């Protein structure tokens, strides 16, 4: 299996190393526009294989031709969010970048699965889908996996328990309108509402919504990358190993949850064909309304990009 990572920044490079270490790909190609950066990072990763005990070939390049015949393409290219900047502020600049990147990779790979990480991820997934012409099942956004990871982390920290015992879902857009679904949150099967009062849960939900900007405010000149990379690799491994994992991912909805033709984060089954099933779970009226509001924001922002495709 060949996996290409576009963007050799913090998220892309960290994801590339994790993929190499897990050895579910024969070859990882790291591509970036800056000469020397992907080559140097790829060589450094490859040399770590003697210590970390992996044989995955890691190659760095500035040429999209080296992505030829990729099975999975991970797109992390784009501008990082800065303090005071919302994901939506990145919209026009990153949309133009993603349009160009997608056009280039599709010249050399006929039927890849594209995993989008660049923000605003729901809208960039839309751009990649529109430009690539791939079936909706093969263009997937990473948002819900990361948001769910943060939600689990905050719950575990509050209860002083293992994160491994927490089951949770965060739906909707990867932004301020995300929807942590409290009714589907449990600890070893015990509903979260039996372990924490509602005001504490509301605080955890709010912290989850602001999880990304919390890290941006600490870093000042960058954004999160360890957790985004780990979340992305969890998705890619599920696809590469055909694990049929149920994960919250950004996908194009076709009537599910009453939402049509909008990319939104919902539970899906991930396997060798990409998104193999969209799971429609029962939501409370407030949760369904919140999911619709989240989808409306994504749809509104996507309409702002029409000039990009003129």
From Swiss-Prot:
Matching CDD domains: LDH-like_MDH
InterPro entries named in the record: L-lactate/malate_DH, Lactate/malate_DH_C, Lactate/malate_DH_N, Lactate_DH/Glyco_Ohase_4_C, Malate_DH_type3, NAD(P)-bd_dom_sf
Reactions catalysed, as given in the entry: (S)-malate + NAD(+) = oxaloacetate + NADH + H(+)
Residues binding substrate, per UniProt: 81, 87, 119, 150
Membrane-spanning residues: none
Keyword S-adenosyl-L-methionine assigned: no
Entry binding sites for NAD(+): 7-12, 32, 94, 117-119
Molecular function per GO: L-lactate dehydrogenase activity; L-malate dehydrogenase (NAD+) activity
Enzyme Commission number(s) of this protein: 1.1.1.37
Domain of life: Bacteria
Keyword Oxidoreductase carried by entry: yes
Catalytic residues in the record: 174 (proton acceptor)
Main enzyme class: oxidoreductase
Keywords attached to this entry: NAD, Oxidoreductase, Tricarboxylic acid cycle
Any one biological process term the GO annotation gives: lactate metabolic process
NCBIfam families listed in its UniProt record: MalateDH_bact, PRK06223.1
Family: Belongs to the LDH/MDH superfamily. MDH type 3 family.
Function, in words: Catalyzes the reversible oxidation of malate to oxaloacetate.
HAMAP family: Malate_dehydrog_3
Protein name listed in UniProt: Malate dehydrogenase
Gene: mdh
């Amino acid at each position: 299996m060949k996996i290409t990572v576009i963007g050799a920044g913090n998220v892309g490079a960290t994801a590339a190393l994790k993929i190499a270490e897990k050895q579910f790909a024969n070859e990882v190609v790291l591509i970036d526009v800056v000469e020397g950066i992907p080559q140097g990072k790829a060589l450094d990763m490859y040399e770590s294989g003697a210590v970390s005990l992996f044989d995955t070939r890691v190659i760095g390049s500035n040429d999209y031709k080296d992505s030829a015949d990729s099975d999975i393409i991970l797109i992390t290219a784009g501008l990082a969010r800065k303090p005071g900047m919302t994901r939506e502020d990145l919209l026009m600049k990153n949309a133009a970048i993603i349009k160009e990147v997608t056009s280039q990779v599709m010249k050399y790979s006929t039927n890849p699965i594209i995993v989008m990480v660049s923000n605003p991820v729901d809208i960039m997934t839309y751009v990649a889908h529109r430009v690539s012409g791939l079936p909706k099942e093969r263009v997937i956004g990473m948002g819900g996996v990361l948001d769910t990871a943060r939600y689990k982390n905050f719950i575990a920290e509050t209860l002083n328990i293992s994160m491994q015992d927490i089951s949770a879902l965060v739906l909707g857009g990867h932004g301020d309108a995300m929807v942590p679904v409290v009714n589907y949150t449990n600890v070893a099967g015990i509903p979260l509402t039996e372990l924490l009062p509602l005001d504490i849960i509301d605080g955890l939900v709010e912290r989850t919504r602001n999880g990304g900007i919390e890290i941006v405010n600490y870093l000042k000149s960058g954004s999160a990358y360890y957790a985004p990379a780990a979340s992305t690799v969890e998705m890619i491994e599920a696809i590469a190993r055909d694990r049929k994992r149920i994960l919250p991912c950004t996908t194009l909805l076709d009537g599910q949850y009453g939402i049509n033709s909008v990319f939104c984060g919902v539970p899906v089954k991930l396997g060798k064909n990409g998104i193999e099933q969209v799971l429609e779970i029962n939501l409370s009226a407030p949760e369904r309304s919140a999911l619709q509001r989240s989808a409306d924001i994504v749809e509104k922002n996507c309409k702002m990009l029409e000039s990009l495709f003129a």
